Regions:
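Internal, well-folded beta-alpha domain core
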Residues: 1-121, 131
Length: 131
């Protein structure tokens, strides 16, 4: 395989999964890094990455801002996985290129027709829509 899956069991650790083995160590490091940089996490990771951390602890200890990218289809907002993945990558580029330090500054992001939807966004959930 080209990557090691997190649900692989470790016989040497009593059958503990890779996720559960690394979770405490990664969470401690993650929290230390976030807090040392102002205590705000811009969450652009895919959903399965939450399994790597004690997400409840993360939510309790730092401010999380999650950008979301959705497309209008048939009068409803829908997540199109390939678009969401591409937008997350483009937003990372935007953050680096523009040296974004405040979550509020992400509202200026636009890409391939996706734009900030102020009406449907909150301080912790920034929605960008297409269509």
């Amino acid at each position: 395989p080209y990557r090691l899956e997190g649900d692989v069991r470790l016989p040497e650790k009593g059958g503990l999964s890779m996720f559960n083995y690394w979770k405490p160590l990664l969470t401690d490091y993650f929290m230390e890094e976030i807090k040392s940089r102002g205590g705000v996490l811009i969450n652009l990771a895919s959903g399965e990455m939450k399994d790597l951390f004690d997400w409840k602890r993360v939510e309790e200890e730092v401010r999380i801002v999650t950008p979301d990218f959705q497309v209008w289809k048939g009068g409803q907002l829908k997540t199109v996985v390939i678009y969401a993945k591409m937008c997350r990558g483009e937003m990372v580029r935007y953050i680096i290129k523009n040296r974004i330090e405040r979550p509020e500054d992400l509202r200026g992001f636009s890409w391939e027709g996706f734009a900030f939807d102020e009406k449907r966004s909150t301080d912790s959930h920034l929605l960008f829509t297409l269509g």
